[in-house]
């Protein structure tokens, strides 16, 4: 289609003709019609295409709407799921939170309990430390108390030993007094018999009259005879009362009085008489065939139980009788010698020889197991209990070693001598070689039982220094160390074991007894001894205390056995010895 500016240009340019204008308009009109037809055809195509596009877009819109609806549904579904999960998570979180809070509370309570437990544990530990320290203090105090008990027990035992030694010394002095009384009576009897044989002498002193011995000045005041020169001898009743009532009942006589009697016998010079084992007490007299002029001294016998402890005693130095030998020398030699004197001397020699062989056989017998084991165990426990106690025991043993034990075993002494046996009181101790006192069945059986101890064997050391020697109470004998320092009395005989007295001869006897004892000694020597041998004898402990252990808790002393060594008990039933083992009965 032509634009609007063209007619103006043509008007101005071609105003010449109208035809031209018309042709022009026609041509323009045709062009416009063709353009309109083209425009309509193109618009119809465009409209069809637009409709297709609209349909496609609508279809697409419907699809998108459906998709949106689906997505909205899914969104709603996810929203519900989210809300559900959120609620579940919140509930779980709340539960967990509650559990956390409960666990925190429990943890706090446990921490508080732990703190309280630690505080209580500290208190318990403090109490345990205090208890341990107090226990240690108590253990130390207990050990000190045990040591003090050991020392006090040792002092008590020492006091008992001293008291026992004083009692033994008192008994020995009593026995010596009785022996002096008996000796006085025997000498007076001899003088009266001599005066009967001879013509009665006047009461005045003459040069031929012997001097009065000093022994009559030493006789006790109870005796009715004070001088052997009486013209009229005392009656039998007065002599019996003087010898029987002057001696009170006392513990058994110790064996140490035999040494005093030996010295008196050797110094006085009158013949010795020793009663035979087979003789009875009533048939013993100074002269064998002559009737007895006075009754024998008798008193109740009591002996103490022995528990294996040694009882040393201080030796007493009693002045001897120096004028006895002078009296013997100044006596007239006109006393006739009868056959009964020789017979008595022969019996005395026979008894001396028999006792020597019996004591030599006793020294070889085996030790008793019960006493040895008890003494050794208690002595060993005492050594381990306290070194201070052992030192004190050594110091006391050293202090009393010079005095020694004058009543220990005297088998190795060899200085026993016979004496005149007019006392019917038996001795319940170990008979020494020279002891002439009558022995009963009990005394001989007890001497056999106690002489089997290995400490009876001869030794070079004094008896008090041997730690394993336990001399029982009532078995007292002499000690060579103290016996040599003690002066002899007029009844002792230092040479009674070796040589005959006044020319008397020994009478042979049966040799079977010595053979039996030698056979028993050979058999018993093979038995092992149960006594321990301590290296240091000074550490011997006479006390029987329980050993205190090193821990301090197990050292409680056990109950001690009943000690009856210091009590005077009633005499036991006398056991009968076996006649086949001894060769003869007592």
Swiss-Prot record:
InterPro entries: NUDE (IPR033494), NUDE_dom (IPR006964)
Interaction with nudF as annotated region, ranges: 1-215
Gene3D superfamilies linked: 6.10.250.1080
Example of a GO cellular component annotation carried by this entry: kinesin complex
Pfam families the record matches: NUDE_C
Main location: cytoplasm
Composition skew (Polar residues), residue ranges: 221-233, 298-308, 370-379, 420-435, 489-502, 526-543
UniProt biased composition (Low complexity): 9-19, 234-259, 309-320, 436-459
Region Localization to microtubule plus ends: start-end pairs: 215-586
Source superkingdom: Eukaryota
A single MF term (Gene Ontology): microtubule binding
Region (Disordered): 1-21, 191-274, 297-341, 355-504, 526-586
UniProt GO BP: centrosome localization; chromosome segregation; establishment of chromosome localization; establishment of mitotic spindle orientation; microtubule nucleation; nuclear migration; vesicle transport along microtubule
Coiled coil: 17-197
Keyword Methyltransferase included in the entry's annotation: no
Localisation per UniProt entry: Cytoplasm, Cytoskeleton
Tagged with keyword Cytoplasm: yes
Swiss-Prot/TrEMBL keywords: Coiled coil, Cytoplasm, Cytoskeleton, Microtubule, Transport
Subunit structure of this chain's protein: Self-associates. Interacts with nudF.
Family of this protein: Belongs to the nudE family.
This protein's name: Nuclear distribution protein nudE
Provenance organism: Emericella nidulans (strain FGSC A4 / ATCC 38163 / CBS 112.46 / NRRL 194 / M139) (Aspergillus nidulans)
Encoding gene per record: nudE
